[in-house]
Amino acid sequence: MQTRNTFSWIREEITRSISVSLMIYIITWASISSAYPIFAQQNYENPREATGRIVCANCHLANKPVDIEVPQTVLPDTVFEAVVKIPYDMQLKQVLANGKKGALNVGAVLILPEGFELAPPDRISPEMKEKIGNLSFQNYRPDKKNILVIGPVPGQKYSEITFPILAPDPATNKDVHFLKYPIYVGGNRGRGQIYPDGSKSNNTVYNATAGGIISKILRKEKGGYEITIVDASNERQVIDIIPRGLELLVSEGESIKLDQPLTSNPNVGGFGQGDAEIVLQDPLRVQGLLFFLGSVVLAQIFLVLKKKQFEKVQLSEMNF
């Protein structure tokens, strides 16, 4: 009887341990997923607002350059490269969520015309695969195959991101036409300053929420500070919480004003957006152009031959 109770107790403990481990895994996985800079997918139906502004700029407040290179023209049902360049100083270090310094990561969103989409693996050439590396692209939404996102990925390795794109074929997709189309891109380097819920990260400036005298600065055990501000007019105390990793600009006994910076600005990254144009070219139009150019060349050749023949006739008449 005692042995049976012992086995029952062991079985309950194992079940409880598995349940706890599973819960920890789910919570950890969720926090990792939500930590990716693809927050726009969770909060915006379309990453590009009606004003043309890409919503990533809501979290990445600093303005930095980004560039995109695409062919001027592409033929239907062909694969081409869209290269997004996110330049920055590789020597820079950013403040990580744990307060330590680390390398910058990068991310990008590519908004293609309707009908254009990520090329399937079997259509990508070995040379293009080598340029892509180990990158894994995602659709912004299952029904928005023309909008692609990537990141975060190590900036030192992927400051240039090559997207393999498959051009549509108007012969099979009646919604696509042989026209000039715009392509929009947004790219960030480094962490954002604002989370989607509106709260600040530790990668931005923290300002005083009240004016007065700093009566106390408490350094927290796990990093960060609690700054107590006393309003001299009514003795009201306000405590501002500063997360770890930030450098203070103030000291105890100092008089400060409302919204005065309490920390330096740690942000070394930023977000930028750009655009390009691409022409989906009709192959028949290309063939017609080649035929026309060939006709012009042949006409020039016949003209030269005719001129030489005429000169020979003139020369023979003069000799006669």
Swiss-Prot record:
Disulfide bonds: none
GO cellular component: chloroplast thylakoid membrane
Gene Ontology biological process terms in this record: photosynthesis
Cofactor: heme
Subcellular location: Plastid, Chloroplast thylakoid membrane
Bilayer topology term: Single-pass membrane protein
Pfam families (alphabetical): Apocytochr_F_C, Apocytochr_F_N
Classification via InterPro entries: Cyt-f_TM, Cyt_f, Cyt_f_lg_dom, Cyt_f_lg_dom_sf, Rudment_hybrid_motif
Transmembrane segments: 286-306
Chief subcellular location: plastid
Keywords for the protein's UniProt record, in alphabetical order: Chloroplast, Electron transport, Heme, Iron, Membrane, Metal-binding, Photosynthesis, Plastid, Signal, Thylakoid, Transmembrane, Transmembrane helix, Transport
Binding-site list for heme: 36, 56, 59-60
Signal peptide: 1-35
Cofactor note: Binds 1 heme group covalently.
Molecular function via GO: electron transfer activity; heme binding; iron ion binding
Self-association state and partner proteins as the record states: The 4 large subunits of the cytochrome b6-f complex are cytochrome b6, subunit IV (17 kDa polypeptide, petD), cytochrome f and the Rieske protein, while the 4 small subunits are PetG, PetL, PetM and PetN. The complex functions as a dimer.
Purpose: Component of the cytochrome b6-f complex, which mediates electron transfer between photosystem II (PSII) and photosystem I (PSI), cyclic electron flow around PSI, and state transitions.
Family per similarity comment: Belongs to the cytochrome f family.
Protein name per its UniProtKB record: Cytochrome f
